[in-house]
């Protein structure tokens, strides 16, 4: 990208237009989709111990506004300091959520940004805001929780709640997290897992156990979310990368989703989706 194009891409006009389009598209997906919840009262479970720490996988991050928090509930979300994240930050703010800036590019900047993000997350939780973040982060590996979320729970004393938002129709992008672009006119599943609490005075062993529990909890709720998207007797169309559709099976077995879950979900599932 040339300097001129980079400057244009990071301009206030492009950021404003891009975030407005992103907000419109996400609202369009939500409003044209049939929402199913597990448990039925997801708000009650999500906010029973407010403020909490919402955890999700990066690949299923797009539909986080579908959680639809109560009007008087403050939610903060971490966003990278990288210039490319400005549209994302503005989009989140358009949904009435607070933004906490995380790490930027480069190792030293990432280290400084990570410490600043942790301080910002602690301040948000102390102020009474539920804090949402992806347990995995670029450049990966995908679906491997970092120790930071366990440390945040320890320092704040707040529980971690695994969440998943998935649609049965989507495009999986060819990115490090296989980020899913959710499509309109879908079945949108919102699944909330059980809270994970870090023991008081936890050491490195307990923090690692918490990290593994977050991974397991997120894999479970994500599998359940895609399982709720089943439809019978439909053709199966999967996307290996953006704009590269390929037919994987002519006809699906009854009871499965018309758009299958991502390959990593299917390979980790204990039950057939």
Regions found by a protein language model. Name each.
Residues 143-204:
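A cross-family acyltransferase "interaction/gating" segment
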Residues 84-86, 107-108, 141, 167-172:
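Short gly/pro/ser/thr-enriched loop/turn and capping motifs at secondary-structure boundaries
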Residues 195, 202-226:
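C-terminal functional extensions of proteins
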Residues 16-37, 76-123:
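Membrane-interfacial amphipathic helices and adjacent loop/beta segments
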Residues 1-69, 90, 96-98, 215-216, ...:
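Membrane-anchoring hydrophobic helices of lipid-metabolizing enzymes
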Residues 51-55, 74, 128-132:
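Residue-level preference for the first positions of well-ordered beta-strands
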Residues 118-152, 156:
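Catalytic-site beta-strand/loop segments enriched in glycine and acidic/polar residues
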């Amino acid at each position: 990208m040339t300097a001129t194009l980079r400057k244009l891409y990071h301009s206030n006009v492009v950021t404003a237009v891009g975030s407005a389009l992103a907000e419109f598209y996400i609202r369009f997906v939500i409003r044209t989709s049939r929402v199913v919840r597990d448990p039925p009262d997801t708000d009650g479970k999500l906010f029973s111990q407010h403020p909490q720490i919402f955890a999700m996988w990066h690949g299923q991050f797009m539909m986080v506004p579908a959680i639809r928090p109560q009007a008087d509930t403050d939610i903060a979300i971490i966003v990278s300091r990288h210039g490319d994240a400005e549209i994302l930050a503005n989009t989140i703010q358009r949904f009435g959520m607070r933004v906490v800036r995380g790490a930027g590019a480069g190792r030293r900047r990432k280290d400084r940004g990570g410490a600043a993000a942790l301080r910002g997350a602690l301040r948000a939780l102390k102020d009474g805001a539920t804090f949402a973040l992806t347990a995995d982060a670029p450049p990966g590996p995908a679906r491997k929780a970092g120790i930071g979320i366990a440390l945040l729970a320890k320092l704040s004393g707040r529980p971690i709640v695994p969440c998943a938002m998935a649609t049965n129709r989507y495009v999986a992008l060819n990115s490090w997290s296989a980020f899913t672009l959710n499509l309109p006119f879908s079945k949108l599943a919102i699944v909330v897992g059980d809270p994970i609490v870090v023991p008081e005075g936890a050491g490195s062993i307990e923090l690692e156990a918490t990290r593994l529990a977050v991974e397991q909890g997120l894999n479970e709720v994500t599998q359940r979310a895609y399982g709720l998207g089943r439809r019978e007797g439909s053709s199966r169309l999967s996307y290996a990368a953006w704009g590269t559709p390929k037919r994987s099976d002519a006809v699906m077995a009854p009871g499965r989703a018309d758009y299958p879950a991502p390959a990593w979900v299917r390979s980790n599932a204990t039950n057939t989706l």
